[in-house]
Amino acid sequence: MGTMIRHTFTHRCGALLCALALGSSTMAATAAAKPKKGQMQKLRQRPVWAPTGGRYASLDGAFTALANDASFFEANPAGSANMTHGELAFFHTTGFGSFHAETLSYVGQSGNWGYGASMRMFFPESGFDFSTTTEPVCTPASNPIKQRGAIGIINFARRIGGLSLGANLKAGFRDAQGLQHTSVSSDIGLQWVGNVAKSFTSEEPNLYIGLAATNLGLTVKVSDKIENCTSTCEKCGCCKERCCCNGKKACCKDCDCNCPCQDCNDKGTVHATDTMLRAGFAYRPFSWFLFSLGATTSMNVQTLASSDAKSLYQNLAYSIGAMFDPFSFLSLSSSFRINHKANMRVGVGAEARIARIKLNAGYRCDVSDISSGSGCTGAKASHYLSLGGAILLGRN
């Protein structure tokens, strides 16, 4: 009877994943987009960040409550204190046609304390090219902004019963086509774990609740202000007509390119980073199945008053995720996310465990509005792949 239920559930999970993939493809083919303008001036609000792999790559917002592998840094910094194993993990993430990112993470426990560190570097798909003589580059607004840089994260968490409190400290540097920033920020999180209506025997709890606020900090512009970048914007149709880079002022915000001179601030300018607020719930009713829910929104303390608190509602995104363990050594995961702008995100992943070794792979598809510089409208699906492995380092 149990085998029949598991097989039926497997078939239904497969059907659900197919439906999610079909839905994202349909959205990409039919959604209408608004004309897209340059995004460089918004980078001052964005902390230096690099994607990671692990379970976070496939569960995304639905991982806030769970936060139980070496990718917990993004989801909830309190996760390190409640993990049942320490981990040393490496992840490689590729954004097709966009970037590569490498991550080395460590997490461990000592008594009721959890701690960890993560080092990451990211670079455009074209390669490292960290030449100090690199000139500013202008690209069409519909293309990804080429970024390279690195970030370091230190984590500490404390467990009191089933409740843990944790924090990350982060510092990084980013070069985005000639526009350079450093950022310093912190994350704080809370996680409660316990057993509720548990029908199986396991060392891990079956109920998780998580809250977190990430990227509380600031960026500092470290590149010089560019007054005249006409020669830089050779590929920008708007700049060729000299309607923005006219030698008298920097690019206007309506320019249809991503050019470093769109940030008109002077060197040394400080700006608050966008803060992400997260809440999540996860429950494992059976030993072989877990489902999770998550909600996220973003705000910027520097612009919140002028943009009105309605932005908290407008930036809301909702996630649902599931993990299915068909065998004791294999876990499959999937998630679906949608926000108020109807942008969608679908993720799937697999994790294999062999003794003290974990191997994982995750795939994510983002469907968002884009347009070309000519004003054409449509929607674009961006694809990301993560591969990684971890060594389990003893039991908490």
Swiss-Prot record:
Residues 1-28 form the signal peptide. Keywords: Signal. Belongs to the UPF0164 family. This is UPF0164 protein TP_0858.
